[in-house]
């Protein structure tokens, strides 16, 4: 619980919080209704939405750029992501987007950045769930899928319920690279995106100028990035799907 102290502080919860490593006997047990959770519960109960949105919005004033890219590029190698996210960062930074790595900031700074943003681009991930509590009404959210099994429906349900907006979902996945004993794309997998198509999609959506020419890695550079990731994680990757062996041979 100690690692969550900043979040509880942002919520204005100052009661002592204790955890127990062994079973306990209590005189009275209060089990509240689950206000938020999986599937349909991503919409949140009305009471939960009011509480979370009001408390977190009060934790920090808006501070930051009105165009924000939420990045996973500096997360540990064991966490999932996409190849060449740094290229996405660099090109969006050229266009004036603030590149934000939320795990490097306290929750109050994260809230301040999200409250200031009118346009957010991000890979699917937990940072988008926090942003849904505090983004301004009318904000534009673009979610890039990083894995083919990402449940975009959950994010859409949350944003429609909390903010009345529908995130745009961009699916330009070429391959899911999986490791270990994984049989499907999961939180550890790495997506290989069709980067030219990604930026063409941004142009069609009006997120970037149509005459913008992105600087993108070629196939050789992408394979070098994949090898670097293999080295850092200490395990081989394979492409999910029937063409895995052929693709790995080409990558080698």
Question: Model segments located where?
Answer:
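The feature primarily captures lumenal catalytic ectodomains
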Residues: 1-252
